[in-house]
């Protein structure tokens, strides 16, 4: 309740000052009128001199009345304004405390709702995991049975098909067999270049054998005759009786016995000569050529082979465990900033001398711009972004102690704007097109005021010039440097912060950073994730050729607000693109 007490005291003090001023002024007027009537009573006595005194007293009284009345009225208004300021300050703090309390209460409620929703989600996920873990063995066993039956049927069908292929190929090979047989028979009966063939060779062989037999036949007859006649002749001589003289008879048998081979040889020669004379025409080696017979034509049926069927065993991977992620609620961040007052306050106190020694105060106004910022952030996911560098707010005060007490206070607030820009890797932002009136600047350089003072008799002239520049410009930072660090960004999001102090924003960078802006070497790390594992260790080397053409991000439009709420919009265009290509090799191994 102290602020109410101060308000009452200030109010009554102002009223008292006004009443005192009015009373004093009325009293002064009454005294002046009384003095005027006294002067008028003595008019007849001091008429010439009092006329001049009368006209001199009235202007002085009026000037004193006006000065005193104006001073008291101004002091009273200042005290009333001070009282209103004192009462509004606690109200402002009270409203701020109330707003903070309401926001904190809503924050707690929202965090509890998120925690409850996360608990329900995690419970459902856990239940699904348990169900999957329970049915997983049954599904895997059923899968294995289906795979075994499929492979068994596949092998049986493959064997049946192989037997059918063998039998079919046997019958399909018969045309080839008959073709080969006909070619062989044709080769037996062909007569290339008067060479002997089967049709001429057999008669020639028969004729040769007949001629050879006919030539040897007399010798055979002679030999057989000798072998047949000699024993019979010896036997006949030996068994013949002896006639006459026994000695002569014995001697005659002995001579005949001794000459029996000669007689047999003569007889065989006679037989041979007789046979040669009878079979002379058959002893020849001449053969008669016979004409070739027509060739056997081979069949023209096509020969077809059935291809063997290639089969491959089929295997089904086991059902893997369900991979889920627990949902962890993130506490929301609430920031309620106090109203920010931005403006220029100029106060000139000029003392002007008067004939009565009084002073007159001339006070020029205060330009006030007020903005209230409420920032409410509910963070569920982390967004990869990068921000502009914040420029610290600038507050400059200029003062100079002079005889006339001229004081100037300049408050300049620099607005902080951060922008998350989506940058595609391998984009060279070499050209930035700014609209007219937008340039690079250094907000730390503030304009200096210019002052001039001139004095003369009973007057002081003071001239003060302050250049307050509200200029929209882009502060220099890494994006406009010689090199550009390319990185991944997800969502283009505009962050506006208006504050008297520098706000610290953590710069979260996620992505692939290249040391050189334009480079022919593309280095990347690829992580290949497997959702299905195999019980058999396998390894393989895969070579993949990768190429991509990045596209520059679309033009971004920014809207800024100066302290007097005038929107200034301009567009930054990023022009240029680069194409990269290369080979990416990696080794895949599972176990």
Swiss-Prot record:
Keywords: Signal. Residues 282-319 are annotated as: Disordered. Residues 282-295, 303-319 have a biased composition (Low complexity). Residues 1-24 form the signal peptide. This is Uncharacterized protein 56.
């Amino acid at each position: 309740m102290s602020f109410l007490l101060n308000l009452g005291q200030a109010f009554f003090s102002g009223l008292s000052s006004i009443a005192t001023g009015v009373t004093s002024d009325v009293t002064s007027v009454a005294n002046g009128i009384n003095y005027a009537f006294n002067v008028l009573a003595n008019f007849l006595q001091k008429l010439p001199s009092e006329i001049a005194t009368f006209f001199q007293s009235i202007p002085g009284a009026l000037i004193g009345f006006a000065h005193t009345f104006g001073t008291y009225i101004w002091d009273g208004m200042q005290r009333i304004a001070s009282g209103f300021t004192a009462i509004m300050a606690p109200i402002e703090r009270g409203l701020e405390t109330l707003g903070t309390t309401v926001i904190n209460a809503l924050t707690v409620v929202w965090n509890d709702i998120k925690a409850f929703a996360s608990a329900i989600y995690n419970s459902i996920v856990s239940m699904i995991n348990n169900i999957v873990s329970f049915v997983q063995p049954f599904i895997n066993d059923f899968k294995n049975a289906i795979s075994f039956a499929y492979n068994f049927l596949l092998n049986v069908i493959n064997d049946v098909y192989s037997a059918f292929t063998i039998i079919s190929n046997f019958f399909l090979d018969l045309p080839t067999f008959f073709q080969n047989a006909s070619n062989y028979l044709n080769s037996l009966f062909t007569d290339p270049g008067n060479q002997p063939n089967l049709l001429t060779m057999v008669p020639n062989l028969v004729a040769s054998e007949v001629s050879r037999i006919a030539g040897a036949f007399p010798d055979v007859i002679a030999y057989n005759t000798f072998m047949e006649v000699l024993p019979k002749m010896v036997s006949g001589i030996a068994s013949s009786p002896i006639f006459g003289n026994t000695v002569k008879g014995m001697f005659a048998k002995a001579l005949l016995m001794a000459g029996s081979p000669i007689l047999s040889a003569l007889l065989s020669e006679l037989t041979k000569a007789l046979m040669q004379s009878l079979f002379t025409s058959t002893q020849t080696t001449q053969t008669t050529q016979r004409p070739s017979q027509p060739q056997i034509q081979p069949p023209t049926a096509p020969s077809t082979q059935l291809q063997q069927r290639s089969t491959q065993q089929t295997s089904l991977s086991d059902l893997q465990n369900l991979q889920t992620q627990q949902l962890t609620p993130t506490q929301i961040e609430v920031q309620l900033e106090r109203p920010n007052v931005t403006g220029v306050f100029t106060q000139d106190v000029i003392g002007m001398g008067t004939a009565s020694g009084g002073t007159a105060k001339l006070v020029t106004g205060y330009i006030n711009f007020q903005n209230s910022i409420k920032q409410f952030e509910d963070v569920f996911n982390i967004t990869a972004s990068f921000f502009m560098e914040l420029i610290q707010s600038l507050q400059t005060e200029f003062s100079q102690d002079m005889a006339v007490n001229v004081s100037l206070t300049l408050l300049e607030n620099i607005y902080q704007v951060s922008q998350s820009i989506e940058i595609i890797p391998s984009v060279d932002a070499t050209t930035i097109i700014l609209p007219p009136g937008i340039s690079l600047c250094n907000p730390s350089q503030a304009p200096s005021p210019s002052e001039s003072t001139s004095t003369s008799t009973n007057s002081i002239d003071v001239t003060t010039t302050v250049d307050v520049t509200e200029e929209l410009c882009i502060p220099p930072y890494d994006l406009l440097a010689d090199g550009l660090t390319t990185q991944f960004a997800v969502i283009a999001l505009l962050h506006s912060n208006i504050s008297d102090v520098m706000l610290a924003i953590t710069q979260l960078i996620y992505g692939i950073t290249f040391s050189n802006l334009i480079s022919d070497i593309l280095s990347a790390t690829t992580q290949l994730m497997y959702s299905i594992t195999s019980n058999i260790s396998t390894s393989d080397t895969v070579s993949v050729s990768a190429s991509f053409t990045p596209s520059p991000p679309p033009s971004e439009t920014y809207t800024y607000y100066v302290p007097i709420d005038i929107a200034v919009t301009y567009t930054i265009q990023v022009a240029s693109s680069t194409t990269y290509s290369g080979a990416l090799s990696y080794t895949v191994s599972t176990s």
